[in-house]
């Protein structure tokens, strides 16, 4: 069988996101940082669904930062559509496994 190289290690989350309360139209950041080798890829999920970022759509108002954090250029929140409010987790993966962060809720403050 193939032996693991000494340096390779499964992901672990070293910075978890925390709950946020933000105003509509304001920027916001959910932090996430993971370690591992090879460097884990980071994806965000909200309510079990993968969050689309600028990596999926260059016009997206959500950006995946190099650190793994999720940055909202502005929080989108309307009567009918509330795409940003919810409970988020970040998932770090490499070929050795995956690590899931704590839940963080993003709440939009009512004016």
Model-derived regions: residue spans:
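Immunoglobulin-superfamily
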Residues: 1-111
């Amino acid at each position: 069988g193939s032996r693991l190289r000494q340096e390779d290690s499964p992901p672990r989350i070293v910075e978890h996101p925390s709950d946020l309360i933000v105003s509509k139209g304001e920027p916001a950041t959910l932090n996430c940082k993971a370690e591992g080798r090879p460097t884990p890829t980071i994806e965000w999920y909200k309510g079990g669904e993968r969050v689309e970022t600028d990596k999926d759509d260059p016009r997206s108002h959500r950006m995946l930062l190099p650190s793994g954090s999720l940055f909202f250029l502005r929080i989108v929140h309307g009567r009918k559509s509330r795409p940003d409010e919810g409970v988020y987790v970040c998932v770090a993966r490499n070929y050795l496994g995956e690590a899931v962060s704590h839940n963080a809720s993003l709440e939009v403050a009512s004016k």
